[in-house]
Curated annotation (Swiss-Prot):
Task performed by this protein: Putative amino acid transporter.
Alphabetical GO biological process terms: amino acid transport
Protein name (database record): Uncharacterized protein 399
Organism taxonomic ancestry: Viruses, Adnaviria, Zilligvirae, Taleaviricota, Tokiviricetes
One GO cellular component term noted in the UniProt record for this chain: host cell membrane
């Protein structure tokens, strides 16, 4: 929904169904589990029931943390808004730019996963297909009426299809398994579905009845995704793989909506120029331009990183840093410790078990190490440059 500044503040335009749909689509059901199921089938010796349950349990502390932050600070901008409230202008500027670019750089990577599922490996074809989706998605987020209808329809559609698939082809069979492979599968479900829980925090200032909507948006959508993921994991896998593009197309409007609110909020804070303070062609053109640059770098020039390492960077910029903001804002040491412990366990298992498993390494970790290091370094450097330009030359960012 379009953000408008009025004398009374932000217009509350998101209802309960919108919030439920947005978070559900961000996680995905059919497609969010397709890639984990594909890799798990190659690893073998995976108990899918245990993997999904473990994966879902891993992220419950994050879910609770975001629910508390969203209801306590119903501000647009999500993670950036919490960091801005807790820390200095220098830090929140660097963080905001780095977070935004993390979203920009992730979209071609996720698009490539979908295309590889259809054996489209030509770099130029990948570039063209991913690029063709950008303007379509931006047109969707430009209209609040169209956006609301599409996210609600896509969410309901995914639920209906997921139930139908489970009803027609559910076939539970006990699976012999190893603990290590099942844990790796759990991490895949996290990286593909269960860590994508914080979309509604970026539009919190536009939510009607914030507590009720957040409860349903966070916990009910999470429960629906977890339950249907279990049911569909024991159903017709070929159908699930064929439906994987649904998730990418569902994810893109949500991720671009997040970018628009992030850009807009940074513009309000003078981190970015004021011309981006409204959702208008300027914002849409900025999103399109940066995503096109990312698409060129990753699909034409080959400067890409692996799906798994991209997910870990997402965890760092979205969750680990925000956990410290949560501690400062809420003084809740218990939940803070649980969140960091859960994330630390996942990161440890990712590297310790992942490097030992050739299938997991090939499909999740292997990638351009040099570019990965460069990407880790360059995002905060760009953020620091933006801070210096806006503060020293334009002198608009407060100290």
């Amino acid at each position: 929904m379009e953000l408008e500044r009025k004398s009374s503040g932000i217009i509350k335009s998101f209802n309960v169904l919108d919030i439920f749909s947005i978070n559900l689509l961000y996680m995905g059901i059919l497609s969010g589990i397709s890639y984990p199921l594909f890799v798990s089938s190659l690893m073998k010796n995976v108990n899918l029931l245990f993997a999904i349950v473990i994966g879902a349990v891993f992220e419950i502390p994050l879910l609770l943390m975001y629910y508390k932050l969203t209801t306590k600070f119903p501000l647009n901008g999500g993670d950036y808004a919490y960091i801005r409230t807790a820390f200095s202008s220098k830090f929140y500027t660097i963080f905001g730019i780095s977070l935004w670019l993390t979203y920009v750089l992730s979209q071609p990577i996720l698009g490539d996963l979908v295309l590889l599922n259809f054996n489209i490996q030509n770099q130029f074809e990948q570039f063209l297909i991913v690029e063709s989706l950008f303007p379509l998605v931006l047109l969707i987020i430009a209209s609040k009426r169209i956006y609301a209808k599409i996210v609600d329809i896509l969410a309901i559609f995914q639920i209906i299809i997921a139930i139908f698939i489970a009803f027609k082809s559910f076939n539970y069979q006990y699976q012999t398994f190893t603990i290590s492979n099942t844990l790796l599968s759990a991490l895949l479900f996290d990286l593909s579905a269960f860590i994508f829980i914080n979309a509604i925090s970026y539009i919190a200032g536009e939510i009607k009845n914030i507590k009720k909507s957040s409860m349903i948006g966070y916990f009910v959508s999470y429960g629906v995704v977890a339950i249907l993921s279990i049911l569909d994991s024991y159903s017709n896998l070929n159908i699930l793989f064929a439906l994987m593009p649904i998730w990418f197309f569902s994810y893109m409007p949500i991720a671009n909506k997040i970018q628009s609110r992030l850009i807009q909020t940074m513009s309000f804070d003078k981190v970015l120029p004021e011309k981006f303070s409204k959702i208008n062609p300027n914002v849409l053109l900025l999103i399109f331009s940066t995503e096109t640059i990312a698409n060129v770098l990753e699909n034409l020039l080959g400067f890409n990183i692996s799906f798994g390492l991209d997910g870990l960077l997402f965890i760092f910029w979205n969750f680990i840093i925000v956990a410290f903001a949560y501690l400062k804002l809420m003084n809740d040491k218990k939940l803070f410790s649980i969140v960091l412990t859960s994330l630390a366990i996942q990161i440890f298992l990712f590297f310790y078990l992942g490097y030992q498993n050739p299938i997991f390494y090939k499909f999740v970790i292997a990638g351009n190490i040099e570019y990965t290091i460069l990407r880790i370094m360059i995002l905060p450097i760009i953020g620091a440059i933006v801070y210096l330009l806006r503060k020293s030359k334009i002198n608009v960012i407060p100290k």
